[in-house]
């Protein structure tokens, strides 16, 4: 078991009822996390009898997992605002309130995206000065990973929102991923400054003026897989389309490679020889190893995983929360916003 010398415990509230494979995969993800690290306590939120039945399958340090009863579940098809307002005993609302009341350092869920986005703003609340909280997943590239921000939270963003996304994304990549002076680019249809729609044209000069980020200009969609930027800024509609295309294409390519390798006896022999290198390459492009997408700019950490998240993504999302807390990402975002506000007032 990995030991933390300071033994400062990170408490992660985990939605045991959210996602396509709940409660089995969230529970297994929690167990794997606490079996790997002693500096984590997972608060499993859900229908207690169901959660405990899953826990009975595993051996784990009992003091590191606590079951919090939540009778209700918010389904994906439910209108998010109504669900958050009416289902006070749902796993999502209970988890969000634990973060708000400082009973947990973070909340992780594979549940309803809409409910998580609404709950994050309504219950946890925004850091003072943050106009909109963006959803920011990591996507694999040939050079490592890039942060795609925003990917689903703000489909009607303004230029000032995108500037804040760039700053928050830069802080996240530098402190969580350890990338010094991360390259920030705005997603565009060409490299020239005059290219793009009205939002991009308005945002570009504002980003150029920012002295606290390393703005490198525009990035085209075809350049994303090559890792030409560490932080890719866009509004949520475009970001979500890029993310879903990225994920779908990755799955298609893996399937095509497997099919081709098994098509003939010669290809099967070649596949056996190439298998170690192929596994290593495919692992590098497996987004689940990086955890979920944080909703940045809130008064507490909220992480949204894929609805289809298996245990490994849940576990890595929990580890992600530990790093977020240790690096005081919210404190750094708050400090940056205060500094920016003071400069604007000069």
Q: How would you name each of these model-derived features?
A:
Residues 60-104:
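Phosphate/nucleotide-donor binding subsite
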Residues 24-25, 37, 41-43, 48-52, ...:
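Glycine-rich phosphate/diphosphate-binding loop of Rossmann-like nucleotide-binding domains
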Residues 2-52:
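N-terminal phosphate-binding or glycine-rich loops at protein starts, especially the Walker A/P-loop
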Residues 121-134, 138-148, 228-232, 236-346:
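Glycine-rich phosphate/nucleotide-binding loop
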Residues 15, 44-46, 68, 109-111, ...:
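Short beta-strand segments
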Residues 22-26, 89-102, 106-120, 127, ...:
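Short glycine/serine/threonine-rich phosphate/pyrophosphate-binding segments
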């Amino acid at each position: 078991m990995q030991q933390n010398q300071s033994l400062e415990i990170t408490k992660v509230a985990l939605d045991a009822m959210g996602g396509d494979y709940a409660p089995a995969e969230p529970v297994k993800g929690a167990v794997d996390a606490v079996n790997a690290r002693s500096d984590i306590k997972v608060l499993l939120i859900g229908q207690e009898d169901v959660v405990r039945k899953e826990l009975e399958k595993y051996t784990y340090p009992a003091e590191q997992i606590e079951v919090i009863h939540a009778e209700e579940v918010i389904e994906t098809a439910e209108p998010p605002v109504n669900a958050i307002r009416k289902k006070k005993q749902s796993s999502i609302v209970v988890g969000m309130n634990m973060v708000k009341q400082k009973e947990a350092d973070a909340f992780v869920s594979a549940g309803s995206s809409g409910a998580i986005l609404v709950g994050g703003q309504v219950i946890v609340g925004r850091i003072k000065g943050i106009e909109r909280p963006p959803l920011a997943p990591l996507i694999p590239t040939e050079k490592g990973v890039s942060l795609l921000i925003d990917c689903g939270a703000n489909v009607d963003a303004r230029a000032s929102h995108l500037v804040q996304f760039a700053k928050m994304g830069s802080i996240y990549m530098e402190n969580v991923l350890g990338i010094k002076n991360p390259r920030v680019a705005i997603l565009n249809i060409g490299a020239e400054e005059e290219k793009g729609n009205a939002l991009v044209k308005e945002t570009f000069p504002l980003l150029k003026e920012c002295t606290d980020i390393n703005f490198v200009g525009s990035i085209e969609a075809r350049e994303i897989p090559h890792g030409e930027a560490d932080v890719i800024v866009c509004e949520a509609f475009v970001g979500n389309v890029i993310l879903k295309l990225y994920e779908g294409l990755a799955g298609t390519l893996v399937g095509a490679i497997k099919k081709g390798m098994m098509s003939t006896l010669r290809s099967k022999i070649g596949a056996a020889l190439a298998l170690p290198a192929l596994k290593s390459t495919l692992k590098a492009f497996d987004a689940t190893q990086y955890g979920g997408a944080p909703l940045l700019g809130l008064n507490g950490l909220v992480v949204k995983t894929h609805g289809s998240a298996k245990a490994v993504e849940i576990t890595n999302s929990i580890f992600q929360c530990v790093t977020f807390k240790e690096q005081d990402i919210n404190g750094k975002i708050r400090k940056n916003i205060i500094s920016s506000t003071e400069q604007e007032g000069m």
